[in-house]
Amino acid sequence: IVGSVCSTSYLHFTSSHSNELYVYNWGEYIDESVIDEFEAETGIHVTYDLFETNEEMYPVIEAGAVSYDAVCPSDYMIQKMVENGLLAEINFENVPNIANIDPVYLEKSKAFDPENRYSVPYTWGTVGIIYNVQKLEELGVPAPTKWSDLWDERLKGEILMQDSVRDAFMVALKELGYSMN
């Protein structure tokens, strides 16, 4: 009934293939029709691989079996990947649309990519609570208004959460009165 939603990803590019683009992204972030349109317009074939968590993505990139042109890790993972030599600097001459990104997001990105050399903000989101009003009414539980509401005993066994260690820790930290950061 209750879940957390988080969506913050960054696009990282390299250019190692001429008529083929290898992309590694979160599941359900780009509709297949967009890829089809891109291929039709450019003549470039897209190999589009999916991952569900940063922790699933990281060892694949680290192993180097596939040389991806674009990888879409979350903010904290970019810093780890840069520190471990897994991301190349982006040639921004090949990314003219960076001019269309709100400077607010580029500034926020400096927290993990201080000179914005390795990433481009691609999506931005928040962590929140989604709930089924009807199910809560059946359980006699009021709609949650704060993270601590998730510890209501009547919700035991009824909560679903996105598979994200970082989000789970954030919820627990908030419950204990700490900053989510």
State where each predicted segment sits.
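Early extracytoplasmic/lumenal segment of secretory-pathway proteins
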Residues: T8-N84
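Hydrophobic membrane-insertion alpha-helices, especially the h-region
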Residues: I1-C6
